[in-house]
Amino acid sequence: MDTPSRISTKLKSLFPKGGSSRWITRERPKIDRIACPWLVLRFIDPKAEFLYVPPERVIAEGREHGAEPYDIPGVHFSHNGERCSFDAFIEEFALRDEALERVALIVRGADTGAPTLAPEAAGLLAISLGLSQMHDDDHAMLQVGLIVYDALYAWARHASGERHGWPPAGFGQVA
């Protein structure tokens, strides 16, 4: 089965009433709770809806709103061993993309306290924590976070080999 068919079949099993998918997690999102919506919107369901609620309300409001919970203990789309929720989405929807695998390693390192998994993980953690200080509105933070993850994915696809140093290329030795 090709990837679009697999994704469609999986979405129908998760959301039998049809329409756009709806996902719910804890409020005040950081790494995984921004990375997962980015992944869903870019690779799984561009019309997906995301709800952020107090931790103790995730399951009840998920049932009430027909939303699938993610990134909380005890649900399918969550951490499993050393893997984070982002990994669970990639595995469940069988997404295969070299750049996405690189992004997943960075997200996993930042989200699980293992920054040595990828040099970029510490930077992603710093940016995520900074964004959370700048935005009180979870959906506003999500919108900014989508840009961050778009940039990270573009880097992983096209620019991960690019290096910067001094002096700039083409200037030779600077006296």
Can you say where each PLM-predicted feature lies in the sequence?
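Non-catalytic regulatory/linker segments of enzymes
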Residues: R6-L41, D45-A48, P54-R57, P73, ...
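Polyanion-binding interface signature
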Residues: K17-P115
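N-terminal acidic, proline/glycine-rich, low-complexity intrinsically disordered segments
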Residues: M1-S5
